[in-house]
């Protein structure tokens, strides 16, 4: 049946990790920080165990069980599982395109997971104006934290994200006009081993993900 349907004979020997290695090698069109995050998620949650599965043997029930394990045993939030799914689904799509699978076993699995689990969504609550003033007052009057005052004052006054604020250069600031040009973000790449051990980290600047991110405030 496999040969009749165009499935490669070597499919029985190819693991999910093998397909991920190929996917990572040929994938284009992602911001570097997004790509690095995908690599981290796969290596942290998929590669050690589920990644050793033979691609041709994967069934939808296997993917369901894997996601249930992430939710029930590892306690991951739905947002993290969603990100893992984004990577896994692309890898399995490539396996289908390359004739290692007939169909993608991860199709619609995440939707079913969301229905089956009662995930709690933590709503973010913005600081009130009074709370913002109290924070700035505390920072300015506490010697231990005074060095944090300028960046918090800028972020609260402009709405800049952390990466946007920490990536500012003097050439981005016009003191006479009282404006800031936002045209890049500072990104921290934190590389870890599968066991959580750090290998090192570095910083880099990237353009915003969307055109709307480039602005003057």
Regions found by a protein language model. Give the residues of each.
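N-terminal core-binding DNA-recognition domain of tyrosine site-specific recombinases/integrases
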Residues: 12, 24-105, 123, 143-144
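Short, structural beta-strand-to-alpha-helix junction motif
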Residues: 14-19, 54, 169
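N-terminal alpha-helical segment
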Residues: 16-19, 62-63, 147-148
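Secondary-structure transition/turn motif
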Residues: 68-72, 181-188
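Basic, Lys/Arg- and aromatic-enriched nucleic-acid-binding interface segment
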Residues: 78, 82-86, 97, 101-103, ...
């Amino acid at each position: 049946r496999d040969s009749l349907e165009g499935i490669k004979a070597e499919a029985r020997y190819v693991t999910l990790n093998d397909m991920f290695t190929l996917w990572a090698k040929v994938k284009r069109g992602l911001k570097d920080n997004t790509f690095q995050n995908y690599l981290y998620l796969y290596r942290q949650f998929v590669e050690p165990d589920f990644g050793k599965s033979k691609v041709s043997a994967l069934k939808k029930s296997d993917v369901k069980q894997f996601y249930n394990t992430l939710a029930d045993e590892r306690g991951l939030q739905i947002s993290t599982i969603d990100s893992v799914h984004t990577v896994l689904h692309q890898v399995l799509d490539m396996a289908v395109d390359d004739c290692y699978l007939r169909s993608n076993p991860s199709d619609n699995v995440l939707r079913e997971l969301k229905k089956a689990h009662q995930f709690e969504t933590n709503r973010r609550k913005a600081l009130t104006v009074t709370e913002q003033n109290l924070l700035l007052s505390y920072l300015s009057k506490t010697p231990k934290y005074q060095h944090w005052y300028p960046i918090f004052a800028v972020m609260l006054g402009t709405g800049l994200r952390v990466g946007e604020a920490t990536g500012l250069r003097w050439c981005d600031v016009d003191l006479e006009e009282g404006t800031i040009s936002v045209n890049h973000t500072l990104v921290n790449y934190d590389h870890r081993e599968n066991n959580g051990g750090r290998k090192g980290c570095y910083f880099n600047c990237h353009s915003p993900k969307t055109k709307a991110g480039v602005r003057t405030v």
